[in-house]
Amino acid sequence: RLVLLEQQFMGLEKYDRMDPNRVCFSVMYNDSYMYSAGNHTGYVVGTMNELCNLEKFSTTSIWGPAHEVGHSYQTKPGLCWLGMTEVTNNIHSLYVQTSFGNQSRLLDKQGDYTSIYEKSMCMYFVRKRAHIITDSDVNVFNQLVPFWQLYLYTKAIGQEDFYKDLYELIRINTDQDTPGKSQLEFTFLASKASGLDLTEFFVKWGFFEPIDIEKSDYSKGQFVVTESMIDETKQRITDLGLPKPKG
């Protein structure tokens, strides 16, 4: 069920793109804990007591395998540009976690904040941080919040297929050649998939902050978003002629 949920979430079933191959879950006898590789996901033998216990697997232990399978299904670079490797796979993790009836991990306490949500809103809404930056104040779970909020909002207004349609748009459109362009293209395609002008949403969450930094994400690269790139993307969204979200 875990694998099927992730496949359905990204529109593989809806758009007749289901993979005929199975997802391989391998037991590993080393110290790698859990990981995703090109042809399998691996789990150290010490985790078997939890992963092979149905009650634990479907509750406290669901995040790990959902996270690793999420890596296997990440769509690069459209929804996995530089800096998002340990972020956007967790959209899948959250979907699986909550689909199994568990509380969202984003409701967990974070430091002095009542939840990851609260700290994230402080970091982005109040401090006006660029979404791509991580440090002692912001981690991958804070970066995850806007992606999950898109799911929750579109679901609340009856758009159950938002991410299915967004993934399909990412699959059929031309990949961008830089991480910064990929981030901005995501804002455009998300607006298109939702039928809503999401400019203000992405402004609040730091996607439209100009930045030029070296970013480390397993490999290193330059992450550049300029004012002119931002202006061009905002205009493209405006040209879609979409209404703004309500509420």
Where are these regions (language model features)?
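Intrinsic structural disorder
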Residues: 39-43, 113, 178, 202, ...
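Active-site-proximal alpha-helical
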Residues: 117-218, 223-225
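Amphipathic alpha-helical surface "interface" segments used
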Residues: 23-32, 170-171, 221-228
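Non-catalytic terminal regions of proteins
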Residues: 216-247
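Glycine-centered secondary-structure boundary/capping sites
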Residues: 8-17, 101, 195, 207, ...
